[in-house]
């Protein structure tokens, strides 16, 4: 359910564990083009990290003491395929959930968390054989070239052409690609043997911004 249900529970004097659908339901899709529910929100790792389990403005000091923790939920309707989708939906969103559970609001910093996650913790997940969702690259097409921005330092980004999905055997992206057929390219981040991001296509820059008020 939503954040307000947890707040209402606390205001009625109940000990409460916060589990709002729009932040901690891991059966929600992680982007517009990925498998999963959408009724609560599109929930990526950054959105999980943004959630503050103990609302400062809505509750008194004594009421906040009734919040005993935060929890993630993963319902199974979409977990039948592809293979190991439960791991993909869980990690690294669980890492973000864990950090907000034990961190004070003033200590939270997305850039710091993301750096620690991509520099060390993803490697731990890979060594454990977890098929986590890696962070996708961004690809832009301009002046006859596709330029890819990797999601973090030394990320392994591979690409495929003609509508096929990139695999671990696909060419490694190392420099801008000259082409007229940018719409045929897909790019994906890989980590270890099991983890990968969703694939992305190159986008052209907007020609102009339209303002209907003028």
What do the predicted segments below correspond to?
Residues 104, 108-214:
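Short, compositionally stereotyped local motifs that mark structural "simplifiers"
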Residues 1-145:
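Flexible, acidic glycine-rich loops studded with aromatic residues
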């Amino acid at each position: 359910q939503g954040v307000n249900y947890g707040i209402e529970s606390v205001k009625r004097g109940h000990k409460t564990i916060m589990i709002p659908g729009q932040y901690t339901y891991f059966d929600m899709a992680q982007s517009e083009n990925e498998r999963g529910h959408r009724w609560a929100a599109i929930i990526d790792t950054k959105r999980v990290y943004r959630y503050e389990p103990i609302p400062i403005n809505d509750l008194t000091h004594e009421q906040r003491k009734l919040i005993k923790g935060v929890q993630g939920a993963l319902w199974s309707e979409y977990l039948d395929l592809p293979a190991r989708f439960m791991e993909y939906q869980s990690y690294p969103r669980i890492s973000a959930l864990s950090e907000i559970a034990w961190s004070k609001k003033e200590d939270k910093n997305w850039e710091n968390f993301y750096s620690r996650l991509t520099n060390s913790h993803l490697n731990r997940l890979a060594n454990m054989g977890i098929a986590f969702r890696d962070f996708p690259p961004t690809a832009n097409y301009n002046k006859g070239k596709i330029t890819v921005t990797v999601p973090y330092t030394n990320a392994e980004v591979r690409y495929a052409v003609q509508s096929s999905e990139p695999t671990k055997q696909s060419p490694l992206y190392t420099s801008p690609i000259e082409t007229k057929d940018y719409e045929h390219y897909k790019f994906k981040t890989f980590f270890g043997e099991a983890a990968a991001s969703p694939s992305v296509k190159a986008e052209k820059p907007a020609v102009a911004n339209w303002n209907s008020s003028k």
